[in-house]
């Protein structure tokens, strides 16, 4: 569907903002996606972007509806894995498993099939079938030494499933393999390895510590103000005493003057 030039430019600007913000500020990305959706709801790319923005903010029912709309418009199966993952998000892992067995999966490219395998394994874990999840992830793609964009996540998911099954030594090995493939920091495999080795992560700043120059708590500030006020009162009292002593000296001098006059 083609749009008038001005409208197309407005839609494009909003879609650019969705792509730019979806990782760092999903809620803001979602807001931009809603604007694009109001402007051009019959454009497949807009429905897809709205779906991913809703997915990023865990609005799974809304995301699923948008992905379905985009698929109806394009006929593409590309969104099939993320649609299945939305079913998981909605607490329906059995539907995700059913989707993993549909003919659409065979039409996916290699990356899409790996994504579907990850979703299916996640659904197995949702249903408490950890051993089945491990078997689901075992594949030629997992065994391959070649590194692709999906390799770190596949190895990480396998390591995580092994750890849940109590197979710690194997889990450590696969977290290590995930880390080797993860050049972009897509996973926290290094942290998981450290945890398995007994490393504890603590905040550099303790709960009772305050950074230098930190403002005092309200109660502490009030106490400081009260102390300052007491000092001021004491100073005032001392000034009053000095004034009284001064008055007495003046009176004494006055008496001396009066006495000399009388004399």
Regions found by a protein language model. Name each.
Residues 20-21, 53, 84-86, 123, ...:
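Residue-level signature for tetratricopeptide repeat
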Residues 221-254:
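Long, acidic low-complexity intrinsically disordered regions
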């Amino acid at each position: 569907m083609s749009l008038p030039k001005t409208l197309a430019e407005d839609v494009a600007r909003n879609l650019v903002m969705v792509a730019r913000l979806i990782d760092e500020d999903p809620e803001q990305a979602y807001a931009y996606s809603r604007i694009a959706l109001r402007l051009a709801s019959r454009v497949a790319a807009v429905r897809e972007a709205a779906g991913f923005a809703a997915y990023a903010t865990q609005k799974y029912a809304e995301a699923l509806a948008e992905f379905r709309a985009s698929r109806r418009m394009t006929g593409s199966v590309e969104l099939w894995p993320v649609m299945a993952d939305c079913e998981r998000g909605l607490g329906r892992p059995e539907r995700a498993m059913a989707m993993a067995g549909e003919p659409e999966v065979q039409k996916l490219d290699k990356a899409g099939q790996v994504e579907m395998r990850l979703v299916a394994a996640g659904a197995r874990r949702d249903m408490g079938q950890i051993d089945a999840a491990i078997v689901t992830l075992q594949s030629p793609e997992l065994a391959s030494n070649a590194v692709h964009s999906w390799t770190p996540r596949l190895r990480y998911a396998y390591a995580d499933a092994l750890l849940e099954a109590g197979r710690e030594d194997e889990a450590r090995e696969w977290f290590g393999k995930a880390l080797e493939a993860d050049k972009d920091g897509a996973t926290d495999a290094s942290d998981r390895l450290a945890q398995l080795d007994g490393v504890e992560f603590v905040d550099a700043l303790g709960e009772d510590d305050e950074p230098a120059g930190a403002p005092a708590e309200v109660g502490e500030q009030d106490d400081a103000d009260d102390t300052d006020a007491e000092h001021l009162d004491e100073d005032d009292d001392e000034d009053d005493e000095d004034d009284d002593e001064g008055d007495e000296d003046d009176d004494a001098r006055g008496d001396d003057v009066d006495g000399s006059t009388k004399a």
